[in-house]
């Protein structure tokens, strides 16, 4: 799964801006972030490795689109005098959040433990790591939806029609 997320990330960074070149960057950032969150939720619920690899590649692609779009918007919005400091601050903040997540996520996973759910004749077992990923996916999807709504620069145009026109 580690290799597939980075394969998807590279594909999203390389091809996302080309595929969605006519799409609004502001809308693309929020939408891609929300879709990444939804695929992270799906990944947390899937126990089949082949399907998980496919979902992970798609997750990585939308994460790459979010990453490159976010950094592009940041570079366009920030003035030249403070751009270097702004990017340094963002990179430092990313590292701090990464260390915090690496410290806190195992604690959450251990606290949640393992749960078994029974549906009719089948049984599904989820461990704390899967539920922690599920929580992270829900948070990412909610943050993506909120950012999409806040940065919506064309309120009269629906997301679906904007995607269709961007892909033509």
Mark where each language-model region is:
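C-terminal transmembrane bundle of multi-pass solute transporters/carriers
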Residues: 1-167
